[in-house]
Swiss-Prot record:
GO MF entry, a single one: N-acyltransferase activity
Entry-linked CDD domains: LbH_LpxD
GO BP term (any one): lipid A biosynthetic process
InterPro entries registered for this protein in UniProt: Hexapep, Hexapep_transf_CS, LpxD, Trimer_LpxA-like_sf, UDP_GlcNAc_AcTrfase_non-rep
Catalysed reactions listed for this entry: a UDP-3-O-[(3R)-3-hydroxyacyl]-alpha-D-glucosamine + a (3R)-hydroxyacyl-[ACP] = a UDP-2-N,3-O-bis[(3R)-3-hydroxyacyl]-alpha-D-glucosamine + holo-[ACP] + H(+)
Homology family: Belongs to the transferase hexapeptide repeat family. LpxD subfamily.
Active site: 253 (proton acceptor)
Its job: Catalyzes the N-acylation of UDP-3-O-acylglucosamine using 3-hydroxyacyl-ACP as the acyl donor. Is involved in the biosynthesis of lipid A, a phosphorylated glycolipid that anchors the lipopolysaccharide to the outer membrane of the cell.
Gene of this entry: lpxD
Keywords: Acyltransferase, Lipid A biosynthesis, Lipid biosynthesis, Lipid metabolism, Repeat, Transferase
Pfam families on file: Hexapep, Hexapep_2, LpxD
Protein name, entry field: UDP-3-O-acylglucosamine N-acyltransferase
Length: 342
C-alpha cells in the first residue's frame, strides 16, 4: 500500500478513464460507466473502491474472495472470481499494472532546477538546463551533465564524465571514466568506472595493471543500488541500451552486456566476457572470464558458467549445463541419496 508520506495519490478516477489510458485493454464489460476507483491494491487488501491486478497465477485463488471493484487479468485468464469484481483482460497485465501505477501516483519529493549551495561544481563543468544538483555533490572539471538531470546528495562525478539527458543519479553514487547515455537511472551507492581487478604476478608480488579503458553506458539503462562496474584495461566496459541491472551486481573490466539484458542481484561477471542481447541472468549467477554468452540466453539462479553458451539456450547448475540435463542431474542425485545405506 502506497504511503501518503512519500507518494501523492492522483485519484479518484473513473474506470472508463483508466481503460482509455491503458490502451492495451483487449476486452472489458460495458457495465462500469459509474464506477469510480480511488486506489490500487493487491487482491487480498482491495476494497470496493479499489482496482487490483493479477499477473502471476499463483495468486488467482484470491480472486474468489477479493473485494476489488475491478481487476486487470491476463489475456486468456478464465479462473473463478468474485461475481462482484469486474475482470478487465489485458494483453500484458503486469505491464498494464505498471502504467496504472504511473497514472495513480506521483512522488511527493520534488527536484527544483537549482544547484545547492553545498555542492562543489568545477568552473569548466557544463550543467544542462533544468538540472538539480543536490547537497554535497562534487562535479569535477570538464564534466557534461545533460538537460533535466537529477544528481542527489553526496554523489561524485569525476573529471571528464559525460552524463546524458534526463539522468537520475541517487545518493552517494560515484562515476569516473564514463560516458553515459540518456534516460539512465543509477540507484544509491553504485560505483562506476573504478579500476578493474587486473594484476600481473612477478616473483611473488602482485602488480596492478594500469587501466586505460572507460565505461560506456547506453540509453534507458537502470543500474541498481551498490552495483559496481569496473572500467576496462584496454577494451572498454560496455552496457548497451535498455539493460536492467539489479542491486549488488559486479561487472568486471572489459565486459560487454548486450541490448535489453536483465541481470539479477548478486551476479558476478568476470573480465572480458560478453553477454548477448536480451539475456537473463538469475540471482547469484557467476560468469567466468573471457566467455561468450549468445543472444537470448537464460541462466538459472546460482548457476556457475564456465564455458561459452550458444544463443537461445537455457542453462542451470554449477557448472551450468542445458536446463533439462540439470533437472535430470538433480533427480538422479535425489535417487542416489535415497539408495545410500544409512
Amino acid at each position: 500500500m502506497a504511503s501518503s508520506n512519500f507518494y501523492k495519490n492522483l485519484g479518484p478516477r473513473k474506470l472508463t478513464t483508466i481503460i482509455d489510458f491503458l490502451h492495451d485493454i483487449i476486452e472489458h464489460p460495458k457495465i462500469y460507466e459509474d464506477i469510480v476507483i480511488h486506489d490500487i491494491k493487491i487482491l487480498q487488501e482491495a476494497s470496493r473502491n479499489d482496482i487490483s491486478f493479477l499477473s502471476n497465477t499463483k495468486y488467482s485463488e484470491f480472486l474468489k474472495t477479493t473485494n476489488a471493484a475491478a481487476c486487470i487479468v491476463p489475456k486468456n485468464f478464465k479462473g473463478e472470481v468474485n461475481p462482484n469484481t469486474i475482470l478487465i483482460h489485458a494483453e500484458n497485465s503486469y505491464f498494464a499494472y505498471g502504467k496504472l501505477i504511473d497514472f495513480f501516483y506521483a512522488p511527493i519529493k520534488s527536484y527544483p532546477a537549482k544547484i545547492m549551495k553545498s555542492a562543489i561544481v568545477a568552473a569548466s563543468a557544463i550543467i544542462g538546463k533544468n538540472c538539480y544538483i543536490g547537497h554535497n555533490v562534487v562535479i569535477e572539471d570538464d564534466v557534461i551533465i545533460g538537460d533535466n538531470s537529477i544528481i542527489e546528495a553526496g554523489s561524485f562525478i569525476g573529471r571528464g564524465v559525460n552524463l546524458g539527458r534526463n539522468a537520475r543519479i541517487e545518493q552517494h553514487v560515484s562515476i569516473n571514466y564514463a560516458i553515459i547515455g540518456d534516460d539512465v537511472v543509477i540507484l544509491t551507492g553504485a560505483k562506476i568506472g573504478q579500476d578493474g581487478f587486473g594484476f600481473s604476478t612477478e616473483k611473488g608480488v602482485h602488480h596492478q595493471i594500469f587501466h586505460t579503458g572507460i565505461v560506456k553506458i547506453g540509453n534507458n539503462v537502470k543500474i541498481g543500488a551498490n552495483t559496481t562496474i569496473d572500467r576496462g584495461s584496454l577494451q572498454d566496459t560496455i552496457i548497451e541500451d535498455l539493460c536492467c541491472i539489479d542491486n549488488l551486481v559486479q561487472i568486471g573490466h572489459g565486459v560487454k552486456i548486450g541490448k535489453g539484458s536483465i541481470i539479477i542481484a548478486q551476479v558476478g561477471i568476470a573480465g572480458s566476457s560478453t553477454i548477448g542481447k536480451y539475456c537473463a541472468l538469475g540471482g547469484q549467477v557467476g560468469i567466468a572470464g573471457h566467455l561468450n554468452i549468445g543472444d537470448q540466453v537464460q541462466v538459472a539462479a546460482q548457476s556457475g558458467v564456465a564455458q561459452n553458451i550458444e544463443a537461445g539456450k537455457i542453462v542451470g547448475g554449477s557448472p551450468a549445463v542445458h536446463i533439462m540435463n540439470w533437472h535430470r542431474q538433480s533427480i538422479i542425485m535425489k535417487q542416489l541419496i535415497k539408495k545410500r545405506p544409512k
